Amino acid sequence: MQSLTTALENLLRHLSQEIPATPGIRVIDIPFPLKDAFDALSWLASQQTYPQFYWQQRNGDEEAVVLGAITRFTSLDQAQRFLRQHPEHADLRIWGLNAFDPSQGNLLLPRLEWRRCGGKATLRLTLFSESSLQHDAIQAKEFIATLVSIKPLPGLHLTTTREQHWPDKTGWTQLIELATKTIAEGELDKVVLARATDLHFASPVNAAAMMAASRRLNLNCYHFYMAFDGENAFLGSSPERLWRRRDKALRTEALAGTVANNPDDKQAQQLGEWLMADDKNQRENMLVVEDICQRLQADTQTLDVLPPQVLRLRKVQHLRRCIWTSLNKADDVICLHQLQPTAAVAGLPRDLARQFIARHEPFTREWYAGSAGYLSLQQSEFCVSLRSAKISGNVVRLYAGAGIVRGSDPEQEWQEIDNKAAGLRTLLQME
């Protein structure tokens, strides 16, 4: 770990230079040579400082770990206001989670950020103070002194003691029947209903080890992990982008419509072809496309909807249509509140679907079906926090949802959420 040691020594040298006793922000970037095999997630999980946040873009080109919070924000609106107060730092990134309710968030300006973009990496330390940067530099030195060497992540040697679904299968059937009745009566076009599964284990679950296992096997996904403290974390491997913004250029997508995957390429292709031709799944996907376009229309230029694709994952395949446009102004608050929750995770009409979910789902979604990522003045990117799990000591809560439209069958939808949950669940049964 020569690169890390050298980078930290360079940071300390910068902190030993004269720093003014004035308010403000100072960013120290140290080039980080990728000469040795540095596993950023393992290093992050070795530390005893919280919060910890890990994020990897789904094509693998960008990866980041952030450690410690200089300042925290309970909503993306707050975070964007902060960034706009410091326009000289266009690349200053705030990382974290937005809840299913987009007015709630857990976002942070990190003390330390390691970021890899393609073949280049940087270690960044940020100072921020409303009174004295000099004083914050002293705290930053103390922070660096707490860092420890990397330790290998443990295996997931787990014994299940209990399992509970919310709702159970009977409750699920009743819920789907109520939803399809409501749709038939014209009150809703679609509602996305979810199930939470609590898996109890004989010993605590190492959340970072679970994240590492998922990253290894669940390809073509965003990977995200937030450890709130030593026992509580939220993580996932999501196939779905909520949005990516580069200045005013915006990319989003409709990911809706699902069929099982198969390890055999030929059988997987046949399933994918069936998905492309299936009326129910195409209808479900187009509902999401139309809703996204309608929501963005007032804040964007021309909206381009690309042809449908089949996205093949480890356990399932999805229909995806990408949507590209240009914003009238670079504003992540607009992106969040217009796009989240999309019809792919809530339903249509959105407000009525959210009311149905709040009234009838037997658990609170919290971070599930929210979003994970970062914002800066320059750019931003968030994935939808799907295929996700909440870890609380020795309990793992897995989440999975299904889009309910006219003609949905409770048994088929139960099988679909089993397939979706399997992306993470099978990791806990492998060793």
Swiss-Prot record:
Record the organism: Escherichia coli (strain K12)
Entry keyword tRNA processing? no
Main EC class the enzyme belongs to: isomerase
User: What is this protein's name?
Assistant: Isochorismate synthase MenF
The pH profile of the activity is:
Optimum pH is between 7.5 and 8. The mutase activity decreases sharply at pH 6.5 and 9 to about 20% of that observed at the optimum pH.
Which pathway does the UniProt entry assign to this protein? Quinol/quinone metabolism; 1,4-dihydroxy-2-naphthoate biosynthesis; 1,4-dihydroxy-2-naphthoate from chorismate: step 1/7; Quinol/quinone metabolism; menaquinone biosynthesis
Gene name, please? menF
Q: Would you identify the family this protein belongs to, as annotated? A: Belongs to the isochorismate synthase family.
Q: Please spell out the taxonomic lineage of the organism that makes this protein.
A: Bacteria, Pseudomonadati, Pseudomonadota, Gammaproteobacteria, Enterobacterales
| Effect after changing residue 240 to Q | Lack of activity
Alphabetical keyword list: Isomerase, Magnesium, Menaquinone biosynthesis, Metal-binding
Give the quaternary structure. Answer: Homodimer.
